[in-house]
Amino acid sequence: MDSDYSDKKGVSVLMDLFEMKGIRKLVMSPGSRNAPLLFSFSRNPAFEKYVIADERSAGFFALGLALASGEAVGLVCTSGTAMLNYAPAVAEAFYRGIPLVAVTADRPAEWIDQDEGQTIRQEGAMAGFVKSYCSLRAEFDTSASAWYANRRLNEVLNHALMPRRGPVHINMSFCEPLYGTSSGYSGKERAITFVRERQELPEEVWDMLVKRFLEAPRVMIVAGFYPPDEDVSAALQDICKFPHTVLFAESLSNIRTDTGICTADRVLAAAGEDESLYPELLISFGGSLISRMLKTFLRRAKPAEHWGIDERFPAPDTFCALTHHICTGASGFWKEFAGRLKDKAPESLSPEGISYAGSWQKIKRKADLLHRTFMADAGWSDLKAFEVILRHIPHDAALHAANSTPVRYLQLFEHAHYAGGEWSNRGTNGIEGATSTAMGFSEVYSGTTLLITGDLSFMYDSNALWMPYVNGRIRVIVMRNGGGGIFRFIPGPDSLKELETCFETPLEVPVREMAGAYGWRYMKAVSAEELETVLPSFFASGDRAVLLEVETPRFENAPVLKSYFTYISGESYPVNR
């Protein structure tokens, strides 16, 4: 090792293993106790380093880097509450299978709870949402302690990288002095390579699955959030040629087929309570669903069989009907399944089965017509703004949507398939971190990264605006709608006298001033006509990040959306749209 590196042997071991296991991107936050990690990683040319002061923003920035690159990303912070600020991003990564490696510096164990500054109980603090954890001293006194550190670091890092991938936590305690350097350590560490047996389902299992699929009178495939995968889309396109099979693919599934339904809420609103639409066989994959209507429909349907394709163990029983947990990757499963169904034909289909997909397509056409009719003269609102925005997003974009309202509006519109995919932090569904995640994504993605966020979510993550990694490819649309507007739409809070003070929490967001303070270009639209005019220049290439404020009427957004669903469901014709 170069003499410019830390003399703490644990730092050298960690750097070597990071490099050997392909963890080359690191997001670091300033501090004193993590100084050996900071200056050592900074001086090592093998790593791409990002320094972000706010640990919560840093965690989500790393999440965005990992999403865009498909690689594991390291995090480095100092001791104390700095580590706790990683928790939201680490929890999000846990529920989405994203490999983040959180390395937290700590004080010596003997000083915990002894009124030492920046000293808290860090060990196991994130145990509930990491795949693996270890706590080590940065100094090794014996060959046995060096072996132990090497082994534990290998084990934890392998957990992050093995299927299903996910976050891990390495807590490393440092004694003073912290700034010493040494050339006495070789740095040639042992890497334990993880080799997993190729997962292949037995032939008898494939035969059973094919047989059950062909025998089932009504099959529904449901896709939750999933990274873009053209092979999966192609396989599902072939499978959905069977007349007894329908695909519901959420916008975040990044699945695009000719016949798949990607607007679940409006189609289900038009479907009503027709029990003949209930599936006999349900096959699901991907992450959690946005659509509460779809979850409710499937729980009510109680399908006779539900296959969950999921690498997690145990698999979630979201619809209270799970009968088969197929513990394998969705991409390989669908490609193999489509190949085995080639030249097959459904067996003994009932009249309902023969027309199952056709029945859903008929309802979809009805819902589409009602949607177009409603939107043709819909008043200015969030709903209208999303219709306009989605017409202008360039094909090369990566679309990020914040929680909770923006990601739901996306599902009401059929829109283009964007080259960079569609994303949202739906592992935990929190409003924090949306801007930081999009910023991290834009560091890797060469096209336009667009974030659509609400004003409350925007303010919640405003520290992202002053990161030093703002580039000319990032575009942010802030829906200025007066706070947590979703609470005016969902049943319950809208009837309480505490709606504004405890739920919606309206606020005046100084969007223009914030853009100016941090060097962003600023635009604004307060009508559909203004939005149509400003969007081409908003998306035009340039060397500055651009922030567009879209102001909509706070008290009209929820009535318009409620009126929309009333109209789609055919209950009545809206008086005021």
Swiss-Prot record:
The protein's role, per its UniProt record: Catalyzes the thiamine diphosphate-dependent decarboxylation of 2-oxoglutarate and the subsequent addition of the resulting succinic semialdehyde-thiamine pyrophosphate anion to isochorismate to yield 2-succinyl-5-enolpyruvyl-6-hydroxy-3-cyclohexene-1-carboxylate (SEPHCHC).
Query: What organism does the UniProt record list as the source?
Result: Porphyromonas gingivalis (strain ATCC BAA-308 / W83)
Subunit structure of this chain's protein: Homodimer.
Which InterPro entries does the UniProt record give? MenaQ_synth_MenD, THDP-binding, Thiamin_PyroP_enz_TPP-bd_dom
Enzymatic class: transferase
Source species taxonomy: Bacteria, Pseudomonadati, Bacteroidota, Bacteroidia, Bacteroidales
Give the UniProt family note.
Belongs to the TPP enzyme family. MenD subfamily.
Keywords for this protein: Magnesium, Manganese, Menaquinone biosynthesis, Metal-binding, Thiamine pyrophosphate, Transferase
Q: In which pathway does it act?
A: Quinol/quinone metabolism; 1,4-dihydroxy-2-naphthoate biosynthesis; 1,4-dihydroxy-2-naphthoate from chorismate: step 2/7; Quinol/quinone metabolism; menaquinone biosynthesis
| Listed name of the protein | 2-succinyl-5-enolpyruvyl-6-hydroxy-3-cyclohexene-1-carboxylate synthase
Record-listed E.C. numbers: 2.2.1.9
Q: Which GO terms describe its biological process?
A: menaquinone biosynthetic process
Catalysis: reaction(s): isochorismate + 2-oxoglutarate + H(+) = 5-enolpyruvoyl-6-hydroxy-2-succinyl-cyclohex-3-ene-1-carboxylate + CO2
Which Gene Ontology molecular-function terms are recorded?
Answer: 2-succinyl-5-enolpyruvyl-6-hydroxy-3-cyclohexene-1-carboxylic-acid synthase activity; magnesium ion binding; manganese ion binding; thiamine pyrophosphate binding
Q: How is the cofactor bound?
A: Binds 1 thiamine pyrophosphate per subunit.
Q: Which cofactor does it need?
A: Mg(2+); Mn(2+); thiamine diphosphate
Q: Name one Pfam family in it.
A: TPP_enzyme_N
What gene name is given for the protein in this entry? Answer: menD
